[in-house]
Amino acid sequence: MRLIAALLSVLLIASTAQSTVTIYESSKPGDFDFYLFVQQWIYSYCDSQTCIQNKEREAFTIHGLWPENSDGSYPSFCSGPSFNVNAIQDLEDQLNFDWPSLTGPNTDFWTHEFSKHGTCSITGPITDIHDYFATGIKLYTEFNITAALESENIYPSDSNTYKPVDITNAITTHFGGKPGIQCSSGQLSTVAVCIDKNSLSIMDCPDLQGWSCSGSVKFPSTA
Protein backbone atom coordinates (compact mmCIF):
# COMPACT_ATOMS: atom_id res chain seq x y z
CA MET A 1 0.00 0.00 0.00
CA ARG A 2 2.81 2.37 0.88
CA LEU A 3 4.45 1.73 -2.51
CA ILE A 4 1.16 2.29 -4.36
CA ALA A 5 0.58 5.55 -2.49
CA ALA A 6 4.07 6.72 -3.37
CA LEU A 7 3.54 5.91 -7.04
CA LEU A 8 0.21 7.74 -7.08
CA SER A 9 1.86 10.75 -5.48
CA VAL A 10 4.57 10.83 -8.16
CA LEU A 11 1.97 10.53 -10.92
CA LEU A 12 -0.10 13.36 -9.40
CA ILE A 13 2.93 15.65 -9.20
CA ALA A 14 3.91 14.82 -12.78
CA SER A 15 0.37 15.46 -13.99
CA THR A 16 0.16 18.79 -12.16
CA ALA A 17 3.52 19.93 -13.49
CA GLN A 18 2.59 18.96 -17.03
CA SER A 19 -0.60 21.01 -16.91
CA THR A 20 1.24 24.24 -16.03
CA VAL A 21 4.30 23.97 -18.26
CA THR A 22 4.49 26.22 -21.32
CA ILE A 23 4.89 24.28 -24.54
CA TYR A 24 8.31 24.75 -26.13
CA GLU A 25 9.05 23.50 -29.60
CA SER A 26 12.40 23.05 -31.30
CA SER A 27 12.09 23.33 -35.06
CA LYS A 28 13.66 24.49 -38.27
CA PRO A 29 13.77 28.16 -39.31
CA GLY A 30 10.50 29.42 -40.73
CA ASP A 31 8.36 26.70 -39.16
CA PHE A 32 5.91 28.91 -37.22
CA ASP A 33 2.61 30.74 -37.74
CA PHE A 34 3.27 34.44 -37.06
CA TYR A 35 5.52 36.88 -35.20
CA LEU A 36 4.98 38.48 -31.84
CA PHE A 37 6.55 41.94 -31.88
CA VAL A 38 7.05 42.64 -28.19
CA GLN A 39 7.65 46.00 -26.51
CA GLN A 40 8.22 46.61 -22.80
CA TRP A 41 7.38 49.71 -20.76
CA ILE A 42 10.65 50.74 -19.15
CA TYR A 43 9.25 52.01 -15.86
CA SER A 44 7.25 48.84 -15.21
CA TYR A 45 10.24 46.66 -16.02
CA CYS A 46 12.59 48.70 -13.85
CA ASP A 47 10.12 48.64 -10.95
CA SER A 48 11.10 45.01 -10.36
CA GLN A 49 14.62 44.97 -11.84
CA THR A 50 17.80 46.88 -11.11
CA CYS A 51 18.16 48.91 -14.28
CA ILE A 52 21.05 50.97 -15.58
CA GLN A 53 19.99 54.45 -14.56
CA ASN A 54 20.87 56.34 -17.74
CA LYS A 55 18.73 53.90 -19.76
CA GLU A 56 15.56 54.68 -17.83
CA ARG A 57 13.11 56.91 -19.66
CA GLU A 58 9.38 57.21 -20.30
CA ALA A 59 9.13 54.87 -23.28
CA PHE A 60 8.37 51.46 -24.64
CA THR A 61 11.45 49.74 -26.03
CA ILE A 62 11.80 46.60 -28.10
CA HIS A 63 12.00 43.33 -26.22
CA GLY A 64 12.00 41.12 -29.27
CA LEU A 65 10.59 39.78 -32.50
CA TRP A 66 9.45 36.27 -31.67
CA PRO A 67 8.21 33.47 -33.93
CA GLU A 68 5.01 32.06 -32.44
CA ASN A 69 2.41 29.38 -33.14
CA SER A 70 -1.33 29.69 -32.68
CA ASP A 71 -1.36 26.88 -30.11
CA GLY A 72 1.03 28.77 -27.80
CA SER A 73 4.14 26.82 -28.74
CA TYR A 74 7.12 28.47 -30.39
CA PRO A 75 10.37 27.45 -32.03
CA SER A 76 13.63 28.44 -30.38
CA PHE A 77 17.38 28.09 -30.89
CA CYS A 78 17.07 26.89 -34.48
CA SER A 79 20.05 25.94 -36.61
CA GLY A 80 21.50 28.87 -38.50
CA PRO A 81 24.07 31.65 -38.32
CA SER A 82 25.53 32.74 -34.99
CA PHE A 83 25.05 36.33 -33.90
CA ASN A 84 27.73 38.65 -35.24
CA VAL A 85 27.62 42.28 -34.16
CA ASN A 86 29.53 43.30 -37.30
CA ALA A 87 26.47 42.33 -39.34
CA ILE A 88 24.43 45.12 -37.72
CA GLN A 89 27.12 47.77 -37.40
CA ASP A 90 25.09 50.31 -39.37
CA LEU A 91 22.10 49.75 -37.05
CA GLU A 92 23.92 49.92 -33.72
CA ASP A 93 23.17 53.53 -32.81
CA GLN A 94 19.45 53.02 -33.35
CA LEU A 95 19.45 49.62 -31.64
CA ASN A 96 21.18 51.11 -28.61
CA PHE A 97 18.22 53.45 -28.20
CA ASP A 98 15.28 51.40 -29.48
CA TRP A 99 16.34 47.85 -28.48
CA PRO A 100 18.51 48.22 -25.38
CA SER A 101 19.16 45.88 -22.51
CA LEU A 102 18.01 47.77 -19.44
CA THR A 103 20.18 45.75 -17.07
CA GLY A 104 23.39 44.90 -18.92
CA PRO A 105 25.41 45.18 -22.14
CA ASN A 106 23.22 45.63 -25.21
CA THR A 107 25.24 43.18 -27.27
CA ASP A 108 24.54 40.42 -24.72
CA PHE A 109 20.81 41.08 -25.08
CA TRP A 110 20.95 41.09 -28.89
CA THR A 111 22.96 37.87 -28.86
CA HIS A 112 20.32 36.19 -26.70
CA GLU A 113 17.39 37.47 -28.75
CA PHE A 114 18.90 36.42 -32.06
CA SER A 115 20.13 33.04 -30.79
CA LYS A 116 16.76 32.14 -29.27
CA HIS A 117 14.31 33.82 -31.65
CA GLY A 118 16.17 35.25 -34.63
CA THR A 119 17.62 31.94 -35.76
CA CYS A 120 14.06 30.65 -36.22
CA SER A 121 12.96 33.81 -38.06
CA ILE A 122 15.04 33.36 -41.20
CA THR A 123 12.17 33.00 -43.65
CA GLY A 124 10.31 35.05 -46.25
CA PRO A 125 11.33 38.72 -46.04
CA ILE A 126 13.86 38.10 -43.24
CA THR A 127 16.91 36.45 -44.79
CA ASP A 128 19.77 37.18 -42.40
CA ILE A 129 20.87 38.76 -39.11
CA HIS A 130 20.73 42.29 -40.51
CA ASP A 131 17.19 41.80 -41.81
CA TYR A 132 16.05 40.51 -38.42
CA PHE A 133 17.18 43.57 -36.49
CA ALA A 134 16.27 46.03 -39.26
CA THR A 135 12.76 44.57 -39.26
CA GLY A 136 12.54 45.10 -35.51
CA ILE A 137 13.47 48.77 -35.93
CA LYS A 138 10.97 49.19 -38.78
CA LEU A 139 8.16 47.66 -36.73
CA TYR A 140 9.09 49.81 -33.72
CA THR A 141 8.73 52.93 -35.85
CA GLU A 142 5.45 51.69 -37.30
CA PHE A 143 3.86 50.58 -34.04
CA ASN A 144 4.29 53.46 -31.61
CA ILE A 145 2.38 52.10 -28.62
CA THR A 146 2.63 55.31 -26.58
CA ALA A 147 1.05 57.30 -29.41
CA ALA A 148 -1.72 54.72 -29.77
CA LEU A 149 -2.57 54.93 -26.07
CA GLU A 150 -2.39 58.71 -25.94
CA SER A 151 -4.80 58.92 -28.89
CA GLU A 152 -7.39 57.44 -26.51
CA ASN A 153 -6.35 59.61 -23.53
CA ILE A 154 -4.30 56.89 -21.83
CA TYR A 155 -1.22 58.64 -20.48
CA PRO A 156 1.60 57.55 -18.16
CA SER A 157 0.66 58.42 -14.59
CA ASP A 158 1.56 57.25 -11.11
CA SER A 159 -1.96 57.96 -9.86
CA ASN A 160 -4.39 57.10 -12.66
CA THR A 161 -5.51 53.55 -13.38
CA TYR A 162 -6.92 52.10 -16.59
CA LYS A 163 -9.02 49.14 -17.60
CA PRO A 164 -7.08 46.53 -19.61
CA VAL A 165 -9.89 46.40 -22.18
CA ASP A 166 -9.49 50.14 -22.81
CA ILE A 167 -5.76 49.67 -23.39
CA THR A 168 -6.38 46.79 -25.78
CA ASN A 169 -9.11 48.69 -27.63
CA ALA A 170 -6.92 51.78 -28.01
CA ILE A 171 -4.17 49.77 -29.69
CA THR A 172 -6.64 47.85 -31.85
CA THR A 173 -8.33 51.05 -33.01
CA HIS A 174 -5.04 52.79 -33.78
CA PHE A 175 -3.32 49.97 -35.67
CA GLY A 176 -6.13 47.72 -36.86
CA GLY A 177 -5.06 44.55 -35.07
CA LYS A 178 -5.86 43.12 -31.64
CA PRO A 179 -2.74 43.03 -29.39
CA GLY A 180 -1.70 41.03 -26.39
CA ILE A 181 -0.87 42.82 -23.13
CA GLN A 182 0.84 41.72 -19.93
CA CYS A 183 0.86 43.30 -16.48
CA SER A 184 3.19 42.96 -13.52
CA SER A 185 2.34 44.05 -9.98
CA GLY A 186 -0.73 45.89 -11.25
CA GLN A 187 1.20 47.79 -13.93
CA LEU A 188 1.07 47.58 -17.72
CA SER A 189 4.43 46.02 -18.53
CA THR A 190 4.40 44.55 -22.03
CA VAL A 191 2.52 44.95 -25.29
CA ALA A 192 2.73 42.60 -28.26
CA VAL A 193 1.32 43.08 -31.72
CA CYS A 194 0.99 40.05 -33.99
CA ILE A 195 2.68 40.26 -37.37
CA ASP A 196 2.04 38.19 -40.49
CA LYS A 197 5.29 36.34 -41.21
CA ASN A 198 5.11 36.88 -44.97
CA SER A 199 3.75 40.41 -45.39
CA LEU A 200 5.02 41.76 -42.04
CA SER A 201 1.67 43.50 -41.62
CA ILE A 202 -0.35 43.56 -38.41
CA MET A 203 -2.96 40.88 -37.73
CA ASP A 204 -5.30 40.11 -34.85
CA CYS A 205 -3.53 38.16 -32.14
CA PRO A 206 -5.14 34.85 -31.26
CA ASP A 207 -5.75 34.11 -27.58
CA LEU A 208 -2.17 34.12 -26.29
CA GLN A 209 -1.13 31.99 -23.32
CA GLY A 210 -0.21 34.21 -20.38
CA TRP A 211 -1.15 37.47 -22.11
CA SER A 212 -3.87 39.07 -20.03
CA CYS A 213 -4.38 41.63 -17.28
CA SER A 214 -7.14 41.86 -14.71
CA GLY A 215 -8.65 44.65 -12.66
CA SER A 216 -7.49 48.22 -13.08
CA VAL A 217 -3.83 48.74 -13.92
CA LYS A 218 -1.35 51.58 -13.75
CA PHE A 219 0.71 52.93 -16.63
CA PRO A 220 3.50 54.33 -14.45
CA SER A 221 5.44 57.51 -15.16
CA THR A 222 8.30 56.58 -12.80
CA ALA A 223 9.97 53.33 -11.78
Curated annotation (Swiss-Prot):
Q: Which domain of life is it from?
A: Eukaryota
Keyword terms of this UniProt record: Disulfide bond, Endonuclease, Glycoprotein, Hydrolase, Lyase, Lysosome, Nuclease, Signal
- Tell me which residues this entry annotates as catalytic: 63, 113, 117
Instruction: Give a short account of what the protein does.
Output: Releases mononucleotides from RNA in the order of 3'-GMP > 3'-UMP > 3'-AMP > 3'-CMP.
Catalyses which reaction? a ribonucleotidyl-ribonucleotide-RNA + H2O = a 3'-end 3'-phospho-ribonucleotide-RNA + a 5'-end dephospho-ribonucleoside-RNA + H(+)
- Enzyme class, broadest EC rank: lyase
Q: Which cysteines are joined by disulfide bonds?
A: 46-51, 78-120, 183-213, 194-205
Q: What is this protein called?
A: Ribonuclease DdI
Show the GO cellular component annotation of the record: extracellular region; lysosome
Q: Name one GO biological process term.
A: RNA catabolic process
Q: Which GO terms describe its molecular function?
A: ribonuclease T2 activity; RNA binding; RNA endonuclease activity
| pH effects | Optimum pH is 5.0.
